[in-house]
Curated annotation (Swiss-Prot):
Species, as recorded: Myxococcus xanthus (strain DK1622)
Subunit structure: Associates with the 50S ribosomal subunit.
Cross-referenced Pfam families: KH_dom-like (PF14714), MMR_HSR1 (PF01926)
The entry's keywords: GTP-binding, Nucleotide-binding, Repeat, Ribosome biogenesis
Organism phylogeny: Bacteria, Pseudomonadati, Myxococcota, Myxococcia, Myxococcales
Identification of the protein by name: GTPase Der
GO biological process: ribosome biogenesis
Length: 459
């Protein structure tokens, strides 16, 4: 998988501003709705031929100075445990603080590659550069002076990050897991929802340590089995190495753990706790599967603790569909990993989704469907002309990806995109992510450029 780069630092040093600047767009909030949110704190980047993923570790709970120090230390510890390179952000205007020194001390002892960034330097004058000088005392090497707000020093920061990445691994940049006949399932979820118990129930043996203490799974655990003549690989996502000083941030970094195994999996099995409603963390993990283009099955565990009443189950299902409507295509199952109830159903559905994940449709059938879609629901008017759909073809699987040739590739309304996606789902019974790419006909851009009136210069 792609290397992970954590952005750490105390509050108000500009971590989120730097994160948005580095990934080139503002993505702190990707869904503005009440209730469950999908705050996204990770994004892919590429520099000098290397792809990697930035993690923004923001989100502190207000408290006194002692609590703040504790939270900053926890943040640094979790970043060291989970990530390959750490960008330690400080505020050059405010100068060194006790929190900065506490984090630096821990990072220095860890031996993890660190880029020390002195933020909020809004120009390159000697006086401003001097403000960053005191941070050399932290013993973390060169200080990268920058201004996240104004975009100064970004190229140098990228260079520093890439220089500290681990050696590139074979298949590191692959967008899809290997197509070798093995179905790869990532068991993801918040701490203490029963991930290890589910794996043990599927394996019918106690191979993974299961405990009521959140964060007892220390590393991703791969387990192989043969199920109905199919080879499966189950990965129980890593929990957090539980240390006495880590108390508050286990949930946040379960996203990082899921990120680590998602890219080498076909299907994400999102485990939830039946005794609790869906929370932000569940939405983040579901959103991660959608954004990474992985098949997703939502499994509500511990159903034995709330009763098997069918009406209650349907009420919970409808609540989930509302909370997680951005993955409305994903099946929702109810199980008890502890008792083994409906565990085989989870594997059956996950196996079906893995096949759909690699589905390929015949081109003639696709184009007959396209004609049918346009006949039933004519394309809208774009820039004063009808939107014309000429041709559709599948260009990739894992997930199914289709290109549609049109006369206005950048003018297709979102509503019509959803219509096409839903028709593809209905026709081919696809309950996995679908990607659509709209493109113009060959030479279309040149023809349109020739049609544009030429501006006349002054005579």
């Amino acid at each position: 998988m792609k290397p992970l780069v954590a952005i750490v630092g105390r509050p108000n040093v500009g971590k989120s501003t730097l994160f948005n600047r580095l990934v080139g767009r503002r993505i702190a909030l990707v869904q503005d709705e009440p209730g469950v949110t999908r705050d996204r704190h990770y994004a892919d980047a590429e520099w000098e031929g290397r792809q990697f993923t930035f993690i923004d570790t923001g989100g502190f709970v207000p408290g006194d100075e002692d609590q703040l120090l504790q939270q900053v230390r926890e943040q640094a510890q979790l970043a060291v445990d989970e990530c390959d390179v750490i960008v330690f952000v400080t505020d050059a205007r405010a100068g060194l603080t006790a929190a900065d020194e506490a984090v630096a001390n821990y990072l220095r002892k860890s031996g993890k590659p660190v880029v020390l960034a002195a933020n909020k330097l809004d120009n390159t004058s000697g006086q401003m550069q001097a403000l960053a000088g005191e941070f050399y005392r932290l013993g973390l090497g060169d200080v990268q002076a920058l201004s996240a707000e104004h975009g100064l020093g970004m190229q140098e920061l990228f260079d520093s990050v890439v220089a500290r990445l681990p050696p590139k691994e074979e298949g590191e940049d692959a967008e899809a897991p290997p197509d070798d006949g093995i179905i790869r399932l990532a068991i993801i979820g918040r701490p203490n929802v029963g991930k290890s118990t589910l794996v043990n129930a599927i394996l019918k043996e106690k191979r993974v340590v299961a405990s009521d203490v959140a964060g007892t799974t220390r590393d991703p655990v791969d387990s192989e089995l043969t199920y109905k003549d199919r080879k499966l690989l189950l990965t129980d996502t890593a929990g957090i190495r539980r240390k006495k000083s880590i108390a508050q941030r286990v949930e946040q970094f379960s996203v990082v753990a899921a990120l680590k195994v998602m890219e080498r999996s076909d299907v994400a099995v999102l485990l939830m706790d039946a005794t609790e409603p869906a929370v932000d963390q569940d939405a983040k993990l579901a959103g991660l599967a959608e954004e990474r283009g992985r098949a997703l099955v939502i499994v509500v565990n511990k159903w034995d603790l709330v009763g098997a009443d069918q009406r209650r189950q349907e009420t919970y299902r409808e609540s989930l569909k509302h909370s997680l409507k951005f993955v409305g295509y994903a099946p929702i199952l109810f199980t008890s990993a502890l008792t083994g109830s409906k565990v085989e159903k989870v594997v059956d559905v996950a196996t079906e989704l893995a096949d759909q994940f690699r589905f390929r449709a015949p081109t003639p059938q696709l184009n007959r469907l396209l004609d049918h879609m346009v006949d039933n629901h004519p394309a809208p008017i774009v820039r004063g002309k009808p939107l014309r759909m000429y041709y559709i073809a599948q260009v990739a699987a894992a997930p199914p990806t289709f290109t549609i040739t049109v006369n206005h590739p950048d003018g297709v309304p979102d509503m019509y995109k959803r219509y096409i996606t839903n028709q593809l789902r209905k026709t081919f019974d696809l309950r996995v992510p679908i990607r659509l790419i709209f493109k113009g006909r060959p030479g279309q851009a040149k023809r349109e450029a020739r049609k544009r009136p030429q501006r006349q210069g002054k005579r």
